[in-house]
Regions:
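An active-site-proximal "capping" alpha-helix that borders the catalytic cofactor pocket
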Residues: 1-12
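Divalent metal-dependent phosphate-bond-processing catalytic cores, especially two-metal-ion Mg2+/Mn2+ enzymes
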Residues: 10-13, 31-32, 36-126
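Acidic/histidine metal-binding catalytic segments
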Residues: 12-24
């Protein structure tokens, strides 16, 4: 997360850098991060400070939704994906779980369609 962000900033790709952070933090805090913090304290502070000030837009939310339904074998049911993450990391914060379900609902309302139909869940295989 921080390496991608810093690298994209160094190249002048601020919007891409933003996505490097926001895709992992649909709740703008590190408190519900799932995974291991393999960053220095300085990098962690940079992530936290940036998350406090970043303004997320529809593109950020769309990338977050895609991240919450993507698996190595294709598109997964969002709850199956979250359960897979829970099994691998031992926990999945309810706040993040609920936020992912809200993202799904948000884009289903925007498109007027089931999100799995939109992304071709039953037909797309990598």
């Amino acid at each position: 997360v921080s390496d991608g962000y810093s690298y994209m900033i160094s190249l002048g790709y601020d919007e891409v850098a933003k996505i490097c952070l926001t895709h992992s933090f649909n709740i703008q805090t590190t408190d519900v991060y799932i995974g291991n913090f393999d960053t220095t304290q300085e990098e962690l502070k940079m992530i936290q400070d940036t998350l406090e000030t970043v303004v997320m837009d529809e593109y950020d939310r769309l990338i977050q939704l895609c991240d919450s339904i993507a698996g190595p074998e294709g598109v997964l049911d969002i709850e199956d994906r979250m359960n897979d993450v829970r099994q691998r990391y031992g926990a999945y914060p309810k706040e993040k779980w609920d936020s992912n379900l809200e993202l799904k609902k948000h884009f289903e309302e925007k498109t007027g369609k089931n999100i799995y139909t939109v992304v071709g869940k039953d037909v797309f295989k990598p």
